[in-house]
Amino acid sequence: MNVSELTPLPDQKVAFTLASVKLLPSVAGCYVLTNFSDEILYVGLTVNLFQRFKQHRETPEKCQPTTLGRAQWFYFVTADETEINAIERGWQNQFSAIHGALPVLNKIDAPVR
């Protein structure tokens, strides 16, 4: 599934590189890791996009190649903390409705929020 098929659509994008961390705000939001072709590899939520991005960059499993390729892009939308659970669940449900499972990297445990 391509990130462009999600509703609501993430409205910002940075490369999934350490150099990009400085471009992220320290606010709540939902995000999607995609490969170079924008195929979804991971869907998540956080109360701090800046910190969460750094955590994912420090998680070897999130940086290794998957069956769909390596994470290249970090798409995100900022949202109030009261809205992020619904946005993330909606994105996961949209993905699962097409593929019958969560994205490949959502199967890897990571620190909460």
What are these regions (language model features)?
Residues E5-L6, F74, I108:
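Short, exposed beta-strand/loop patches in secreted or surface proteins that constitute
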Residues R52-Q72:
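A broadly used, surface-exposed interaction patch
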Residues M1-V47, Q51, Q55, A79-Q92, ...:
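GIY-YIG nuclease catalytic motif and its immediate N-terminal context
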Residues R70-T82:
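Nucleic-acid nuclease catalytic cores
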Residues A97-P111:
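Coupling/hinge elements of helicase-like and P-loop NTPase modules
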